[in-house]
Amino acid sequence: AKATNAAHNLANFQVIVDKEASEAERFIQLLQSVLVMGRAHVADKFGSMPDHYLALGWKMIGTGEHQRAEGQGAKIGWVFDDCIHLDPKAAVSVIRSLSSSNGNYLGSTERSLAKALREANMLAKCDADRNLTKTSVEGRRTYLLCLRLDLVIEQDGPPPKSPILDYSGDDIPF
């Protein structure tokens, strides 16, 4: 009887762990979607265009010398030190909006998502007593979720900070 109870308790615990891991995985997948779809963007530590900007919710607008990158949608975080530092309220708000519009509602609270991300080992760092890290961004200190960058985007080496425009194939008269 004790062995059966222990097995049931372990099975129930595993269901909880699996559910939290799947919530964390869904959160990451939805985060990738909102960035790729242009519903949100992530800036560098100072609020400007980051490396890997196209994968982080930025797009090129304008042409020629007037071409520039612009963040799309709401700013939900910052990227530096190989981490994405997310504002939990902003990120969950945008992600919830997408998840409910596609019929796959992410109903978890910010706190339960942060806990699920921590338990799934998806947080790069967090304070000992909370699932957030106090971080300085854009001249202010705030508590943010710190995710490993490689969970959200693939990195094949350092990208150029700004786009390289290739005019070699153009017929430019001088």
Residue spans for each PLM region:
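Extended alpha-helical interface modules used as scaffolds for assembling large macromolecular complexes
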Residues: A1-F174
